[in-house]
Curated annotation (Swiss-Prot):
Keywords: 2Fe-2S, Chloroplast, Electron transport, Iron, Iron-sulfur, Metal-binding, Plastid, Transport
Cellular-component GO terms for this entry: chloroplast
Protein name per Swiss-Prot or TrEMBL: Ferredoxin
Cytoplasm listed as a keyword: no
GO biological process, one term: electron transport chain
InterPro entries named among the record's database cross-references: 2Fe-2S_ferredoxin-like_sf, 2Fe-2S_ferredoxin-type, 2Fe2S_fd_BS, Beta-grasp_dom_sf, Fd_pln
Originating organism: Cyanidium caldarium (Red alga)
Job description of the protein: Ferredoxins are iron-sulfur proteins that transfer electrons in a wide variety of metabolic reactions.
Superkingdom, taxonomy of origin: Eukaryota
Designated gene of the protein: PETF
Cofactors that this protein relies on: [2Fe-2S] cluster
Cellular localization per UniProt: Plastid, Chloroplast
Quaternary data: Forms a complex with heterodimeric ferredoxin-thioredoxin reductase (FTR) and thioredoxin.
Length: 98
């Protein structure tokens, strides 16, 4: 399956909808489609790529950085997040984690 992922951040001038297969990380799909999103480790072990899920669902079981409260609040590490539905993600949210 493939899902539509709406990536948005007014401050960064981002308002794009990408196609993302359910077996591809959202960060990788965004890069393939020409979007320049922040990242560092690409392994789910830091917060550089963090976004916030505004709607929809992802599988980010590969991540090891976010705590349960942050996950419940909707934070998502785009470098290890597979989409499980159409979703809207607010990008560049590392600073909001703290």
């Amino acid at each position: 399956a493939s899902y539509k992922i709406h990536l948005v951040n007014k401050d960064q001038g981002i308002d794009e909808t990408i196609e993302c297969p359910d077996d591809q990380y959202i960060l990788d799909a965004a890069e393939e489609q020409g979007l320049d999103l922040p990242y560092s480790c690409r392994a789910g072990a830091c917060s550089t790529c963090a976004g916030k899920l505004l709607e929809g669902e992802v599988d980010q079981s590969d991540q090891s950085f976010l705590d349960d409260d942050q996950v419940k609040a909707g934070f998502v590490l785009t470098c290890v997040a597979y989409p499980t539905s159409n979703a809207t993600i607010l990008t560049h949210q590392e600073e909001s984690l703290y």
